[in-house]
Structures are given as C-alpha cells and as structure tokens.
C-alpha cells in the first residue's frame, strides 16, 4: 500500500509517496507539470524488486514549499531540494528520473556522488550541444518565455469544475491519449486540489510550469562528462526532447552509459511503455550487481 509522507525542508513541506516494496532504495523523479503520483502504475511494478519513493518537486503535487516563479533561476533548485531529501533518507539511492526529473538527478549525481548509486535517465531534457549558445541568449533576452512549450504552459487552464470533466477532456488530447491506463488518473488525483472558488485547480500553476520550461539548463553539457555512476538512458524514437544529436554526444561523453531506444514511442516513455521500461531497469540493475534475486 502506498503512503503519503512529509519531509520538512528549509522553506516548506515536501510531499513524497512511499510505494513500498523490498530491495534497494529508489527515488523516482517526475517531469515538469506532473507529480509523483502520476507514475504510480510504473512504481508499483518496480516495487516487485525495489523499494520505491517519489517526491513531489517544488511547485508540484502536494508539496507546499515556496514556489515563486520570479525566484526560480535554474534547475539547480530542484537538485538542491533532492539533496535535502536524500540527506533526510540517510541512504544512497538508485535515482530514476523522467524529463526534468532526470536532469535534476543528474545534477545531484555530479555534485554529490555519495548520494546516488546508479543513474537512470528516461528521455532527459538535454538539448543538443549546438543549441546551447542560442538557448543561453534566449534566456538572457527573455525570449525563452515565448518558446512554444513555455508559452502553452503559461496559457494552460488551471481551473476545472470536477475531476470527471478534466479526465474526460485530457483523455482525448495528446500526450495523454497515448498513455496506458492509470497514469492520467494518478496525475489528476495528486496533481489537482480544491479551488477556493469552487471546483478544482491544477497544483502546478501555469506560471510555475512555464517558468520551469524557460529556465532549462544551457550549460548541462559541462556536467555530463562528470557522471561516474552506472548509467542507463531510455528514450523514445519519436521524442521531441532528447534528440539524436544529444543521444550521440551523450554516449561519447559518458562511454560507460547503456543507452536504449524505444521505437514508436514519444517523450513519455514510462507512460507509453511501462512494462518494457521496468524490464530494462531490472536488467540493467541486475547486470550492474545492484539487484539481487530472480
């Protein structure tokens, strides 16, 4: 049975889910706009051989720590929050992260290698190296706020009359309509909260989600060659996020990394291919001697 718990950070409370399970300790980091509960279907599969936790990042889910978009300068904030949480756990973890959650774990793995035993990056938000100068200028000039993904997030409707309405609406839209059952339901259950004006609202505000996208790291490639942990990268062949030039450069910079592509799969690998994702994770951990038993 999963349980909801609170970690008290220096500037507020962080919610995390303990899905249970036995075996090595795992933390599963979520993508921007979502929450830990979104990944409950895959976390429950991982629990067959692992102990799985997932924290709602600042500005997401049930976490109530301060989330002022004006104060968010980069994704180091999320890595620092993870550092506080992992210090609270008092045990190194196998770090699994999706999208921005993958990058937050990567940043912490380089800063605090003692905290992370292995790094599993699922379609990480790592832009091609050739884009970095342009992205740096976009951030400096404020143009980053106007890129399509940030602009769309900023216009997102956060208010809904009830969970049934938002579920029925989202089921017909991409990316949700390609997700396996349970992921969207987990997102709506833990990613919405009662609104003061009636109905429900998204926990991750449009302003915060947009800001997260617009401060995506422009210097991530300086950290990638410093990865020393056993590393697995899973990505979708149809991803619009982890593109072929980035895949190729990542392999060159981290030659010990195991990289696997999922055909006919988008950025949302865990939601579209949960069984294959779990199988790939178990196989990797077994081969690295980090998973015992059959």
Where is each model-derived feature located?
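Catalytic histidine-centered segment of alpha/beta-hydrolase-like enzymes
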Residues: 262-274, 278
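The conserved beta1-alpha1 loop
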Residues: 29-31, 98, 235
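Helix-rich cap/lid subdomain of alpha/beta-hydrolase
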Residues: 131-196
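Conserved HGGG/HGGXW glycine-rich cap/lid loop of the alpha/beta-hydrolase fold
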Residues: 18-67, 85
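Conserved serine/cysteine hydrolase catalytic core
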Residues: 182, 189-252, 261
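Alpha/beta-hydrolase fold catalytic core
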Residues: 1-29, 47-51, 69, 90-92, ...
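Active-site loop/oxyanion-hole signature of alpha/beta-hydrolase fold enzymes
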Residues: 57-96, 135-138, 279
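Conserved hydrolase catalytic core segment
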Residues: 91-134
């Amino acid at each position: 049975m999963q349980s909801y718990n609170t970690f008290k950070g220096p500037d507020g409370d962080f919610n995390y889910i303990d899905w249970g399970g036995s075996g090595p300790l795992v933390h599963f980091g979520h993508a921007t706009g979502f929450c830990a509960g979104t990944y409950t279907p895959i976390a429950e599969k991982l629990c067959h051989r692992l102990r799985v936790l997932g924290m709602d990042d600042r500005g997401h889910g049930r976490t109530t720590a301060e989330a002022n978009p004006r104060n968010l300068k980069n994704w180091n904030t999320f890595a620092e929050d993870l550092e506080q949480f992992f210090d609270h756990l008092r045990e190194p973890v196998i770090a699994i992260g999706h999208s921005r959650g993958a990058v937050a774990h990567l940043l912490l793995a380089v800063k605090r290698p003692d905290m992370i035993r292995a790094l599993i990056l699922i379609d990480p938000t790592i832009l091609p190296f050739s884009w970095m100068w342009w992205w740096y200028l976009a951030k400096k000039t404020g143009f980053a706020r106007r890129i399509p993904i940030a602009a769309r997030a900023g216009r997102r409707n956060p208010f809904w009359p009830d969970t049934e309405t938002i579920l029925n609406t989202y089921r017909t839209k991409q990316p949700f309509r390609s997700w396996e059952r349970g992921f969207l339901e987990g997102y709506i259950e833990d990613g919405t909260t009662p609104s003061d004006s009636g109905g429900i609202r998204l926990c991750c505000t449009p302003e915060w989600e947009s800001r997260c996208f617009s401060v995506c790291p422009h210097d991530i490639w300086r950290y990638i060659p410093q990865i020393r942990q056993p590393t697995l990268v899973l990505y979708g062949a149809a991803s619009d996020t982890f593109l072929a030039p980035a895949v190729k450069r990542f392999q060159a910079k981290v030659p010990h990394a195991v990289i696997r592509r999922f055909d006919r799969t988008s950025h949302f690998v865990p939601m579209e291919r949960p069984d294959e994702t779990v199988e790939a994770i178990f196989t990797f951990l077994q081969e690295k001697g980090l998973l015992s038993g059959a």
